[in-house]
């Protein structure tokens, strides 16, 4: 299995053949999620929890507190139901763009797991991940893309 990650500027791609399960942690805004992909690149189950503001938009600190409160339970549930911790060969996490306090929670969980398991830690650009999943699913080799996401809206061509 090849795990790809891009720098925040989307310029440099790194690939790493990990040969086993990769846990992925998403924490860019209102959702904290942990999922996995197997050695053939087939995604498994993911478990998520969302912040639902009563009024207005997402408050970054409240969302981060939510993520911190739920991270352990989500990880425990995934490991109990889906994943043998001994088969995990890498930890991937959303490194941005996103809400700073939320990103820090995800990065901390990811770093802790990678350190405990002595496996590689791979930061993934949130924008690039959306684009690459879409590109892979449609089978496009050289698309021109419109990525419309608030302050991160871009027209992208290789």
PLM-predicted stretches and their roles:
Residues 1-158:
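Short acidic/glycine-rich loops and adjacent helix/strand connectors
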């Amino acid at each position: 299995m090849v795990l790809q990650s891009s720098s925040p500027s989307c310029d440099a791609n790194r690939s790493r053949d990990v040969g086993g399960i990769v846990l992925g942690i998403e924490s860019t805004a209102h959702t904290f999620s942990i999922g996995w992909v197997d050695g053939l690149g087939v995604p498994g189950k993911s478990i998520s929890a969302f912040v639902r503001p009563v009024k207005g938009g997402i408050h970054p600190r409240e969302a981060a507190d939510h993520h911190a409160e739920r991270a352990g339970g989500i990880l425990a549930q995934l490991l109990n139901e889906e994943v043998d911790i001994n088969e995990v060969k890498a930890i991937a996490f959303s490194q941005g763009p996103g809400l700073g306090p939320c990103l820090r929670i995800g990065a901390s969980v990811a770093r802790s797991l990678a350190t405990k398991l002595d496996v590689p830690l791979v930061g993934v650009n949130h924008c690039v991940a959306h684009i690459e999943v879409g590109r892979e699913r449609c089978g496009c080799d050289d698309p021109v893309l419109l990525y419309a996401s608030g302050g991160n809206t871009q027209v992208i061509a290789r």
